[in-house]
UniProtKB/Swiss-Prot annotation:
Pfam families: RRF. This is Ribosome-recycling factor. Keywords: Cytoplasm, Protein biosynthesis. The keyword Protein biosynthesis applies. InterPro entries: Ribosome_recyc_fac, Ribosome_recyc_fac_dom, RRF_sf. The gene is frr. It comes from Natranaerobius thermophilus (strain ATCC BAA-1301 / DSM 18059 / JW/NM-WN-LF). It is found in: Cytoplasm.
Length: 184
């Protein structure tokens, strides 16, 4: 039974971690290097992740600075940022690329809050599906007489506690991101 609990918790933890990384890439009006995650640069004919070609920092709340390790790649990096859907316009001075992060409009904030809620709800569905699968496994063990009915019920209660813990964590992550979006 312990393996069922561990497996369920592991899957729920993975779902929460996935939600956190998805939400980190949502632009909330302040400069965050994770905005540029997932951008690949055509570097000598190979698609290379931007963070392997440059140092990305946020020296000010509304400014990202991309400092290429190889200055000859600056044009390629600029093109990759323009082609991506981050919605930022690069300003290239030959040494570094500066990206000014504009203030979010009220409409865009509301749109982002909806996206956050949708991603959160999708993650809750994943967690609930994990709970269902774990409970089904416990019922199967009970049916095969490997565990008693009492053990099955205790196991389902334990699975519910784990589920509640992760649903609460998902809500906390969603609320923090919504706060970040609406407070700027």
């Amino acid at each position: 039974m312990d393996s069922i609990f561990k497996d369920a918790e592991q899957k729920m933890k993975k779902a929460l971690s996935s939600l956190k990384s998805e939400l980190a890439s949502l632009r909330a009006g302040r400069a965050n290097p994770s905005i540029l995650e997932g951008i690949n640069v055509d570097y000598y004919g190979m698609a290379t992740p931007l963070n392997q070609l440059a140092n990305i920092s946020a020296p000010e709340p509304r400014l990202l600075v991309v400092q290429p390790y190889d200055k000859s790649a600056i044009e390629d990096i600029e093109k990759a940022i323009l082609k991506s859907d981050v919605g930022l316009t690069p300003n290239n001075d030959g040494q570094v690329i500066r990206l000014a992060v504009p203030q979010l409009t009220e409409e865009r904030r509301n749109e982002l809050v909806k996206i956050v809620r949708q991603k959160g709800e999708d993650t809750k569905v994943v967690v609930r599906n994990v709970r269902r699968d774990a409970n089904d496994e416990l019922k199967k063990l009970e049916k095969e007489k490997e565990i008693s009915e009492d053990e099955s019920i205790r196991g389902q209660d334990e699975i519910q506690k784990i589920t509640d813990k992760y649903i609460k964590k998902i809500d906390e992550v969603m609320n923090a991101k919504e706060e970040e979006i609406t407070s700027f």
